[in-house]
Amino acid sequence: MPTISQLIRKPRQEKTYREKARHLGASPQKRGVCTRVYTTTPKKPNSALRKVAKVRLTNGFEVIGYIPGEGHNLQEHSVVMIRGGRVKDLPGVRYHILRGVLDTQGVKNRKQRRSKYGAKRPK
């Protein structure tokens, strides 16, 4: 326990917390260009081929973004919008690619949670 004079000399420091999506800066989303689109396998105990893309952002950072939903049309040089949000079983994947924005098409035949996947309302 510090004395009063010690606290006057050096006040208490506030804890600094690490940003979770630091490459976005202060923006909620960022635009970028796909440099590589590929699949990767999750950590144990899960098993799948998860679709991810390496994206070069407009601020110069290169990040890995997850492509949600079934099927996608992304390839190299596709322009995408990225948001924060990690994928728990994919190490290093801390961003999500937004569906139905810029070059990314929405998910086909999506009936529920359509806004998350950029799907139009079915007739």
From Swiss-Prot:
Disulfide bonds: none annotated. InterPro entries: NA-bd_OB-fold (IPR012340), Ribosomal_uS12 (IPR006032), Ribosomal_uS12_bac (IPR005679). The keyword Chloroplast does not apply. It comes from the Bacteria. Keywords: Methylation, Ribonucleoprotein, Ribosomal protein, RNA-binding, rRNA-binding, tRNA-binding. Residues 11-32 are annotated as: Disordered. The modification 3-methylthioaspartic acid is found at residue 89. With S4 and S5 plays an important role in translational accuracy. Interacts with and stabilizes bases of the 16S rRNA that are involved in tRNA selection in the A site and with the mRNA backbone. Located at the interface of the 30S and 50S subunits, it traverses the body of the 30S subunit contacting proteins on the other side and probably holding the rRNA structure together. The combined cluster of proteins S8, S12 and S17 appears to hold together the shoulder and platform of the 30S subunit. This is Small ribosomal subunit protein uS12. It comes from Methylocella silvestris (strain DSM 15510 / CIP 108128 / LMG 27833 / NCIMB 13906 / BL2).
